[in-house]
Amino acid sequence: MLPIKVFSLSRIFVLLAIFRQIHAISINSSTFQVSNSFTLLNNASTLFPVPFDAYTKEYLRTSALLTCAKDSQFSASYFEAAFFPRNNTLFFNVEAQTIMSENITIKAELIAYGLNVYTKVFDLCGIQDNLLCPLKPGNIELMGSYYVEAAVASQIPSITYNIPDLDAYIVVTAYSTIDKEFTKPLACVQVMLSNGRTVQTEYLSWNLVILTISGIMFSVVYSLQGYTVTSTRLASYSISLLLYFQNLAILAMISVSFLPPIVAAWTQNFQWSMGIIRINFMQRLFDWYVVATSGSPTVVYRNKEVLSISVQKRSLNSKIISASSNLNGIESSQKNDLLYTSNLRNSNDYLSKILVLRGIKRVSYKAGIEISNFFLTGFSFFIIFICMIILAFIIFKTFLKVLQKFKVKTIRYLHFHTHWSALLQGTLYRAVFIIYSEISLLALWEFTQTDSAATLVEAIVVFILITVLLSSASVRIWRKMIKSKKIFGQPSYLLFSSSKFLNKFGFLSSQFKSTKVWWLMATSAHMLIRSILVGSLQAHGKSQSIGIFLNEAIYLILLCWMQPYMDKTTNFFNISIHSLNLVNAFFFLFFSNLFQQPIAVSSFMGLIFFFLNAAFSLYLFIFILICFTMAIYYKHPDTRYKPIDDQRRSFLKGEMDDDAVYESVPELHEMKKAVLECNGIQKPQINKIDLCKQNSNCEYLYM
């Protein structure tokens, strides 16, 4: 048996029936709620004979409550409770009010992962001290501890204290004693249980950040050293990995009806890929900025500890949520404007109701970011990212200049020294491609919020700017391929023979086959459609889920058909990622209640979602690490890879043009002039197309 027996319901009814959470915020429409403080843990420390930390490793607690009846005759201003199995002690602190004045019968149900695992019915008059029989109108204040018998506490499986993001809650319904058929509920409350374990961890997030950044940095380093093949593959793998992380983060922003706690926690680990990172001083700065630009900031997160539930006392024909309910019961109850609200701008509104936060609002709250600062947070990290790239290029160029002054050999990086401006533009184009999903979604979200005039203008400008930049780059690459194929009969020639064009746009095009560089436009369109669906349709969770599923399905079908990436390994890598993206989108069809399935189905699909994505993330992690290790191990890493069948290597110039080498180093330039003058030799003009026609092994002529 699970916690109902542990709590000895007849003895502690008040803990189950007179609930009110200190932060009455429904984090998503599944009524999952979050508390960032738990004062009873501190109060309990004075009662333990041994160090308190030894007892807090395992516990069940709750400070979250949802009213599941529209005409409940109970309300509470404060509620916290915790059970510690090491000494079988239950601590509680309750401040509640009631207008009931009759004998009450309680029906309590324990629901775990959508299944009713225990039901108990008892009469309040069975309580020994008889304080609640009959129940009288007025205030009720209880604070203390209760010892639970060891025989009862031992019935709780030990795994209950260790399952991360426990999906369990207690539904308590009050009836009049004369209502033997339980047809007219007087009150209903739902209490969420937690054991403090979660799969949301900063350690995982930072490891993924380091892995992704390392992949991109490795690709840049190998590119500067002339290992273009290795650089292209590392960059392609790292970007695909980052896009997978972004897809998980974006899925969490869909405004679904029920998001299992473990799914919400796991996807929160990837919000950094969307620039959603909390830094305290930045949040204070954003608060000031919104106010200074005549905006109306939200104060939900800052006031989370004083928000409360005020239950309306009107007959609204409520529907009680039970274990046998599907998500329709939750959806219908949350459409009641007298009990629930999603209005973030009216503090008087959500101080008297349950504030339902779905999709982007839920993600923002769980990240510790005020909802009116959501766009500014992601936008600021985009600006910081761009500035860091520019600063890194300037510092590296200055460093090379200093080395040259001290006559240190820097010939290995002469390509960067000569073409640093074009390389910087190319890196910025790559950055725009990486963050396009983030900025387009945040900007479209801001269009619907208008936190202030300044933030709206910034959203419009940055959205238009990055869309135009990425679109123009995609079109230029596609037109260059068409022109090359038309004039030379080789789509690769103009794409790879011009150092300026390659340095500027090669970061975008080199991961694709030369005949399939137009796939960049397809990828950009896929990201834009996803951003439109998630950013603009937050009030329509089912439409979002259907649109995302169709978008992923069409993209995957075309990807499998066209196979546009440079080789089989890269195609397989990307197909596997987008296959899982499609499966994840399918899960969210269930979470949106499109099929009106029982809650248990959604709960167990949430577990499958977590294990599937955790295993796949581990596979990607190992795959990328192996690629890094092999690149470092080989002295010439390009020799590991088979030549790409579009003959691009035939048209790639060396590390740099001969003239550029000599002109970059004055001593070599003067030596070259002297040798040519003495020998009367002029540099021959080589037609690479003619040579390629004459030599079947032309693919390796210009390596």
Swiss-Prot record:
Signal peptide positions on this chain: 1-24
Keywords: Glycoprotein, Membrane, Signal, Transmembrane, Transmembrane helix
Glycan-bearing residues: 28, 43, 87, 103
Cytoplasmic side: 225-238, 396-415, 474-516, 567-571, 627-703
Annotated transmembrane regions: 204-224, 239-259, 375-395, 416-438, 453-473, 517-537, 546-566, 572-592, 606-626
Mode of membrane association: Multi-pass membrane protein
Gene Ontology BP, a term: transmembrane transport
Top-rank taxon: Eukaryota
Subcellular location: Membrane
Keyword match Membrane: yes
Primary location group: membrane
Entry GO terms, CC: membrane
Extracellular topological intervals: 25-203, 260-374, 439-452, 538-545, 593-605
Family in the record: Belongs to the transient receptor potential (TRP) ion channel family.
UniProt-recorded name of the protein: Uncharacterized membrane protein YOR365C
Species of the source: Saccharomyces cerevisiae (strain ATCC 204508 / S288c) (Baker's yeast)
